[in-house]
């Protein structure tokens, strides 16, 4: 295997479909397709006017999110911030987070360190 890998993110399986969240979001986790061992990469999307179906956090992993298209909000613990194109947001381990899209939807890249099994999901994290 060469010392590099290339994959078009549109060709990566959408895990949101597989897990029943396709009504609200898109989640294409590319780390496995790229053969990543210590980092993770995902193309994520939130459909117009929708919110991710759950919040999540990591105990060890640090993540950076880069907004590619659209505007919306991101909840980080108890904080709520506005996000838009080319905003980069670093999230330290332990912080619960989720995105909400504006009327045009939201597309973003998520990347960071990766430790297998290091993730907690909270479906009730961001309720009205």
Predicted regions and their residues:
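A short, N-terminal "cap"/entry segment at the start of jelly-roll beta-barrel domains
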Residues: 1-39, 119-128
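Short beta-strand His + acidic residue motifs that chelate non-heme Fe in jelly-roll/DSBH
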Residues: 54, 74-75, 91, 97-103
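Double-stranded beta-helix
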Residues: 98-128
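Conserved short histidine dyad/triad with adjacent acidic residue
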Residues: 23-29, 42-58
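Short acidic-glycine-tyrosine-enriched beta hairpin
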Residues: 78-93
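Short histidine-centered beta-strand/loop micro-motifs
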Residues: 31-33, 52-58, 100-101, 124
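A generic "binding-loop/recognition-motif" signal
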Residues: 60, 79, 95, 104-105
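Short, conserved beta-strand element in jelly-roll/cupin
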Residues: 43-46, 57-75
């Amino acid at each position: 295997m060469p010392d590099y890998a290339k994959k078009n993110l549109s060709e990566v399986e959408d895990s949101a479909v597989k897990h029943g969240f396709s009504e609200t979001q898109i989640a294409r986790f590319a780390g496995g397709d790229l053969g990543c061992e210590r980092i993770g990469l995902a193309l994520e999307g939130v459909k117009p006017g929708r919110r991710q179906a759950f919040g999540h956090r990591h105990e060890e992993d640090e993540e950076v999110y880069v907004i590619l298209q659209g505007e919306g909000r991101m909840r980080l613990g108890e904080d709520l911030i506005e996000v838009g194109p080319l905003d980069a947001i670093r999230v330290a381990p332990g912080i619960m987070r989720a995105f909400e899209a504006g009327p045009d939807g939201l597309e973003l890249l998520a990347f960071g360190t990766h430790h297998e099994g290091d993730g907690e999901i909270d479906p009730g994290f961001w309720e009205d």
